[in-house]
């Protein structure tokens, strides 16, 4: 039985290694809580008058369901029907899947710099920081002969030009 299992495991690994990866897409979000990604609508927030215009009925009608799985599908349908089905999601703290940065700051530029360079730099301590002094993984890949000119980035925040050294 062990031999059959080992052969099956080897063939599975061989098949996985033979698949050619065409693209790598990294999607990050800023300010999105993991609780909503994995649990859907948070009733405490929906009931809080600071977050609605006096009537939360519409919010509950649109996004509430009996289970976390149903609620998250209602709140983030593309994430759960496409991204989770065809890619990978990380950061469900309920199951100990912590995706933390190593830097001591809890704001954007230092975190994105760490994601893109692979290490924390405590001198990057402001969202107004100058262009990133470090080579990002995207820059490194673009310097490789086979990938030159095939690396792209999109960011909806002006600081990404500095973080990714596009200025």
Predicted region positions:
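Active-site-proximal N-terminal segment of extracellular/periplasmic enzymes that hydrolyze or transfer
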Residues: 19-87
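Bacterial Sec-dependent N-terminal signal peptides
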Residues: 1-21
């Amino acid at each position: 039985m062990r031999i059959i299992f080992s052969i099956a495991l080897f063939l599975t690994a061989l098949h996985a290694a033979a698949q050619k990866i065409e693209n790598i897409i990294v999607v990050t979000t800023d300010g999105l809580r993991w609780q909503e990604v994995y649990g859907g609508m948070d009733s405490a927030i929906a009931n809080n008058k600071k977050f609605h215009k006096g009537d939360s009925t519409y919010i509950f009608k649109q996004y509430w369901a009996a289970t976390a799985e149903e609620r998250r599908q209602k709140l983030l349908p593309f994430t759960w029907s496409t991204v989770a089905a065809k890619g990978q999601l990380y950061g469900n703290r309920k199951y100990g899947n912590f995706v933390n940065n190593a830097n001591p700051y809890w704001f954007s530029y230092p975190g994105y710099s760490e994601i893109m360079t692979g290490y924390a730099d405590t001198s990057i301590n402001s969202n107004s920081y100058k262009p990133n002094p470090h080579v990002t993984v995207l820059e490194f890949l673009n310097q490789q002969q086979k990938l030159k000119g095939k690396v792209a980035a999109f960011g909806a925040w002006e600081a990404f030009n500095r973080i990714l050294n596009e200025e």
